[in-house]
């Protein structure tokens, strides 16, 4: 089964870029959402009330954390 990864990022975010690069290197299917273009901060806080850093990454709609959490799972 292919898991769906969603990366909620923002402009000028090195760890957002690293998360996308990791997905591409590993051949993982992902969707990238950009702050203000694709979602608002309020919408993100509804999904992850204690989000403090970017990116916020979800696998199959479940929040897993940030880049280092993705790297632990797929690095």
Region locations from a protein language model:
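Local sequence-structure signature of Cys/Sec-based thiol-disulfide redox active-site neighborhoods
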Residues: 2-28
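Short alpha-helical
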Residues: 14, 39, 65
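Conserved beta-strand scaffold positions in the cores of enzyme catalytic domains, especially
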Residues: 30-32, 63
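Thioredoxin-like thiol-disulfide oxidoreductase module
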Residues: 34-51
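Structural micro-motif
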Residues: 48-58, 67-68
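Non-catalytic, surface beta->alpha helical segment in thiol-disulfide oxidoreductase systems
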Residues: 59-75
């Amino acid at each position: 089964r292919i898991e769906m990864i969603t990366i909620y990022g923002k402009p000028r975010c090195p760890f957002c870029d690293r998360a996308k690069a990791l997905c591409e290197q590993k051949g993982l299917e992902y969707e990238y959402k950009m702050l203000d273009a694709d979602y608002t901060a309020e919408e993100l806080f509804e999904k992850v009330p204690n989000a403090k850093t970017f990116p916020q990454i979800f696998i199959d709609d479940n929040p897993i954390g940030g880049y280092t959490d993705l790297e632990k799972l797929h690095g």
